[in-house]
A protein has these predicted regions:
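Short acidic-glycine loop/turn motifs at beta-strand connectors
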Residues: 60, 186-188, 200
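Long, positively charged amphipathic alpha-helical accessory segments at protein N-termini or as interdomain linkers
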Residues: 119, 134-170, 197-268
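Residues forming anionic-ligand binding surfaces in small-molecule and nucleic-acid pockets
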Residues: 90-123
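Ordered, amphipathic secondary-structure segments that act as subunit-interaction surfaces
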Residues: 115-116, 126-137
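A structural signal for short, well-ordered beta-strand segments
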Residues: 106-108, 183, 214-216
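Structured beta-strand/loop patches that form or line metal/cofactor-binding pockets in enzymes
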Residues: 165-185, 189-193
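N-terminal catalytic or cofactor-binding beta/alpha core of small enzyme domains
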Residues: 44-47, 90, 121-127, 131
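Active-site loop/lid in soluble adenylation, ligation, and acyl-transfer enzymes
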Residues: 2-81, 85-89, 94-95, 113, ...
Length: 268
């Protein structure tokens, strides 16, 4: 599959206080996953120094993204969702159902060493790093949501909560049917689900990079979804993120733009 240069071009890339932000888009499920995979696998080609890439997006079609190790899908689920696109993520975890214009997805790609113990300003021990990444971004996203939406005064009777057709059939299949200790809920419904992959740098086996994909079920909080709410959540996230994780980057933005266009072919 080719990654069209018009999907990620110079106009869609913005450097905000040392973090590369790719403009919010609404694309099909296969293309959304291809872009995330491309950025992660080509991270070393896109920048010569530590950097962080942040991308918020929505899905233009009904899509089920499958965890990397989810290989066997129950035929009954396939039949009930036969009009949905099923596409693999590069990250692990369980399946996520993406509804057009209803939920919001975040992808973050960066070096593992940005995740630090902020009380000690030290790197997190390797055995705790995955849990720490999950917890860090769940907290950042939740703080961004609650800063945007007054959840204390929400009338839950007006909310059309995210539900699936197969109910208990999806308990072992659906990410949002399973809540981890670090994940956030509202009125008994999971709001944020995160999945992670960590790999060695191709040019430095002693250091590692990570990709985090987080899905936010805003429809489990808001009776009314609109672009201003989504944009405010995104801006709050970027503000929180920059205050906590200030990455030292020199003038790499032009290099990044040129390299992203130059290497815009999957599988290189």
């Amino acid at each position: 599959m080719k990654l069209s240069s018009h999907c990620i071009d110079e106009k869609s890339i913005k450097l905000i206080n040392k973090v590369f932000v790719i403009a919010q888009t609404s694309l099909g499920g296969f293309l959304n996953m291809a872009i995330d995979k491309f950025i992660f696998e080509n991270f070393e080609k896109l920048t010569e120094e530590n950097a962080i890439f942040v991308r918020f997006y929505t899905f233009a079609n009904h899509t089920v993204t499958l965890g990397y190790f989810q290989n066997n899908i129950d035929q009954e689920i396939k039949n009930m969702y036969k009009k949905w696109a099923f596409v693999k993520r590069i990250t692990g975890g369980k399946a996520v159902f993406h509804y057009p214009k209803k939920d919001l997805t975040l992808c973050v790609v960066g070096p593992v060493n940005i995740i630090k113990d902020n009380t000690k300003h030290e790197n997190i021990p390797s055995q705790n790093i995955i849990k720490s990444i999950h917890k860090t971004f769940n907290e950042l996203l939740w703080n961004s949501i609650t800063q945007t939406i007054d959840i204390e005064n929400i009338n839950i009777e007006n909310i059309n909560f995210y539900e699936d057709k197969t109910q208990n059939k999806l308990t072992k299949f659906d990410c949002f049917k399973n809540v981890q200790a670090f994940e956030k809920e509202f009125n008994g419904k999971k709001v944020i689900g995160t999945a992670i992959k960590i790999s060695q740098f191709s040019n430095d086996p002693y250091n590692h990079k990570f990709i985090l994909q987080a899905n936010i079920k805003l429809q489990n909080i808001c009776a009314e979804l609109n672009l201003p709410i989504k944009n405010k959540i995104i801006q709050n996230f970027l503000d929180h993120f920059d205050k906590i994780y200030h990455i030292e980057i020199k003038d790499l933005v032009n290099q990044f733009k040129k390299r992203l266009l130059l290497h815009a072919t999957l599988g290189r």
